[in-house]
């Protein structure tokens, strides 16, 4: 690894340890030329699968779209940003763990609904009403009844 101070190629690792619950390696390095020390972090780069939309189009996974949809459902609900971030990271890990290069947007929608069901029941109903395109109050009521029987 190149030294960020003098750009020398020859550096050595002084110390290594796992961080971020074992998902990263923190390395303390020293330059053999200028003797400066610096820290690097190493992690596996796992790409998100592409999405196959309902009309057949393919597009890259978009974190912003995911967060906008989730935040809209959770608007004015008592859920902390930390809980939202943890749930989104879990959802993204689940998608990466499929090992697939492409997944349908339907799978992502179902995962978001499960995520919201665990965070806030009202947010779940809000999201489900848009995602499932309820046609009338009866469908809305059926989803609420299903939610009540689950708990």
Curated annotation (Swiss-Prot):
This is Transcriptional repressor NrdR. It comes from Psychromonas ingrahamii (strain DSM 17664 / CCUG 51855 / 37). It holds the Pfam family Zn_ribbon_NrdR. Keywords: ATP-binding, DNA-binding, Metal-binding, Nucleotide-binding, Repressor, Transcription, Transcription regulation, Zinc, Zinc-finger. One of its GO terms (molecular function) is DNA binding. Residues 49-139 form the ATP-cone domain. PROSITE patterns: ATP_CONE. The gene is nrdR. Signal peptide: none annotated. GO terms for biological process: negative regulation of DNA-templated transcription. PANTHER family: TRANSCRIPTIONAL REPRESSOR NRDR (PTHR30455:SF2).
């Amino acid at each position: 690894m190149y030294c960020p101070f003098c750009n020398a190629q020859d550096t050595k690792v002084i110390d290594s340890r796992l961080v971020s619950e074992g998902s990263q390696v923190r390395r303390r390095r020293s330059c053999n030329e200028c003797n400066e020390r610096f820290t690097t972090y190493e992690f596996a780069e796992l790409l998100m699968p592409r999405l196959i939309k309902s009309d057949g189009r393919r597009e890259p996974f978009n974190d912003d779209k995911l967060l906008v949809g989730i935040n809209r459902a959770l608007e004015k609900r008592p859920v902390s940003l930390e809980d939202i971030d943890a749930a989104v990271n879990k959802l993204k890990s689940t998608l990466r763990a499929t090992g697939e290069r492409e997944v349908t947007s339907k799978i992502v929608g179902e995962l978001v609904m499960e995520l919201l069901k665990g965070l806030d029941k009202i947010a779940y109903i809000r999201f489900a009403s848009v995602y499932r395109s309820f046609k009338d109050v009866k469908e809305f009521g059926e989803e609420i009844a299903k939610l009540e029987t689950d708990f």
